[in-house]
A protein has these predicted regions:
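C-terminal peripheral helix-coil segments that are non-catalytic and often amphipathic
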Residues: 2-9, 169-203
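Basic/polar phosphate-binding segments, predominantly the helix-turn-helix DNA-binding elements
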Residues: 2-5, 9-18, 26, 48-70, ...
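An amphipathic alpha-helix adjacent to DNA-recognition modules
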Residues: 21-32, 36, 41-45, 50-53, ...
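Hydrophobic recognition helices of helix-based DNA-binding modules
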Residues: 31, 73, 77, 81, ...
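Short, hydrophobic secondary-structure boundary micro-motifs
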Residues: 43-44, 114-116, 125, 179, ...
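Hydrophobic alpha-helical connector segments
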Residues: 85-114
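An amphipathic alpha-helical interaction segment
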Residues: 108, 157-169, 187-191
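Amphipathic alpha-helical packing segments from all-alpha helical-bundle domains
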Residues: 121-146, 150-161, 165, 195
């Protein structure tokens, strides 16, 4: 196994075998299921091991701590968007072309959004979403030998961070608007000059 991502007090491992990948995902599902019955902060590593039927030794081969399980769950949820929408050359391309799917996907993952909101970790979802999209785009360009257009990553960063911010605000409103209205709002924000929104920003 090799380290997949390391940050402030966050470390989990990229699995190179089906067995370890399955164990990692089992811990993630167990954490998600456990939050049905008790707050995230009250769940211990020992509980995750007991509920999953896996040992503490296995846990610490895959994660440093419980928070890393949550980060892995976020990352893998982001990655599974590709499965939700079907095959494509680029996840970023689908987000740009099919925002309706993106909003629908995150409505389906309300439980994860609940955990992040209750633990004040919503910003982590935004950070991991942007990192994943940029990394995925770089890999696609490298694979096909495509040169990067000027400001391409800046534009993608602007779009994805804005779109995920809309998802978060939509969640905070308890998904008060249908997906179609969220897409309409997104289009207005994208194609209306910023000065048009100044009167709302100043209030």
């Amino acid at each position: 196994m090799i380290f997949l991502w390391k940050g402030a007090n966050i470390l989990y491992r990229h699995c190179t075998t089906e067995k370890t990948a399955a164990q990692q995902r089992l811990f993630e599902r167990t954490l998600l299921e456990a939050t049905h019955h008790q707050p995230y902060q009250d769940i211990s590593v020992s509980q995750l091991c007991q509920l999953s039927g896996l040992s503490r030794k296995t846990f610490y081969r895959l994660f440093e701590n419980k928070e890393d399980v949550l980060v892995a769950l976020i990352d893998h949820t982001i990655m599974e968007y590709e499965t939700f929408i079907g095959p494509s050359d680029s996840i970023g391309k689908n987000i740009l072309n099919e925002p309706m799917n993106y909003f629908a996907y995150w409505r389906c993952h309300k439980q994860l959004l609940d955990i992040l909101a209750k633990t004040n970790k919503t910003a982590l979802l935004l950070e991991r979403s942007v990192d994943h999209i940029l990394r995925e785009q770089r890999e696609v360009r490298a694979h096909f030998g495509v040169d990067q257009e000027p400001y391409a990553e800046d534009a993608l960063l602007f779009y994805v961070s804005g779109m995920m911010s809309l998802v978060i605000r939509w969640y905070q409103s308890d998904f008060a608007r249908p997906e179609s209205e969220m897409v309409e709002l997104l289009n207005r924000l994208l194609y209306t000059p910023p000065v048009k929104h100044a009167k709302y920003i100043s209030k």
